[in-house]
Amino acid sequence: MKLEDFDFELPEDRIAQHPVEPRDSSRLMVMNRWTGEIEHRVFRELPELLQAGDVLVVNNTRVIPARLIGEKEGTQAKIECLLLTRRDKDVWETLIKPGKRLKAGQTVVFGDGLLRGELLEILPDGNRLVRFNYQGIFEEVLDQLGNMPLPPYITEQLQDKERYQTIYAKESGSAAAPTAGLHFTPELLERLQDKGVEIVEILLHVGLGTFRPVKVENVEEHTMHSEYYRVTPDAAERINRAKSQGRRVIAVGTTASRTLESVAGENGRIEGKEGWTDIYIYPGYTFKILDGLITNFHFPKSTLVMLVSALAGRDQILKAYQIAIAEGYRFYSFGDAMMIL
């Protein structure tokens, strides 16, 4: 398969620059992946579209304000540091700009010395390992000094940091939001549970590799970034019970779907465990757990478009995207949603 097989023309005015209010007023395209039939709904109507017994699997990661601006120690040279992945208690894999300004052993000072970062190592892919020194609790220091790492295609300033968090976000560690979850409100979750829909939480800390362009012509040759996940034994048991009873398991977002497929055995059961996954899902992949997916509209030639194409078929997805563009759906992180069943 060629990379251009997943390309399409997206007008710039279809890229959502800010979220809609309230969260569940976003539009929802519903696709039957077996027939290709498409329905246009609103996200708050989700309880009408699901059945009692369905399981929604959500990713409860929390985005950290991962973009830090500091100065190289002893100079006034500005350094931008983007936290990507925690590798140890105080050691992070980061993206440093401009990278040439900082050599191993040198230090960046943030917030008048409230936080200091020492460059330990330059990794083969150009990312940097940095050890941080600080007083108090790292997350609190980060909240004080850091900015939300909004995707590069969002050029408007975010007024409310919480708007780039899901309402069920718990454990800090992501460099980007699991954006399919941004459409949920507390009231909508309550209505879903009243309907008999089961909500199961799992964790995957989203890395910025999500936004990295695929640079190979043959999609099979692409290598995915690695991300930390955790599925508790209780979550695994609830999902396995649903599968054994013939109930549908629907992932909220590509991160939840990748986590589920990472812990799935050939027997169609999952086990509770934690670790790192670099699972890469593209057409030809056979899903072991997923019966459906709620996701946003993704950018051309991305691994995310490949994943939804693996579930619903490339031709059907590209056709649905053309309809979405013509109908004025909003794309990307703050955009509208699609449910594939």
Curated annotation (Swiss-Prot):
It is an enzyme of class 2 (transferase). Keywords: Cytoplasm, Queuosine biosynthesis, S-adenosyl-L-methionine, Transferase. It is found in: Cytoplasm. The keyword Cytoplasm applies. The keyword S-adenosyl-L-methionine applies. GO terms for cellular component: cytoplasm. It catalyses: 7-aminomethyl-7-carbaguanosine(34) in tRNA + S-adenosyl-L-methionine = epoxyqueuosine(34) in tRNA + adenine + L-methionine + 2 H(+). Signal peptide: none annotated. It comes from the Bacteria. It holds the Pfam family Queuosine_synth. GO terms for molecular function: S-adenosylmethionine:tRNA ribosyltransferase-isomerase activity. Pathway: tRNA modification; tRNA-queuosine biosynthesis. Its EC number is 2.4.99.17. GO terms for biological process: queuosine biosynthetic process; tRNA wobble guanine modification. Monomer. Belongs to the QueA family. HAMAP family: QueA. Transfers and isomerizes the ribose moiety from AdoMet to the 7-aminomethyl group of 7-deazaguanine (preQ1-tRNA) to give epoxyqueuosine (oQ-tRNA). This is S-adenosylmethionine:tRNA ribosyltransferase-isomerase. The lineage of its organism: Bacteria, Bacillati, Bacillota, Clostridia, Eubacteriales. The gene is queA.
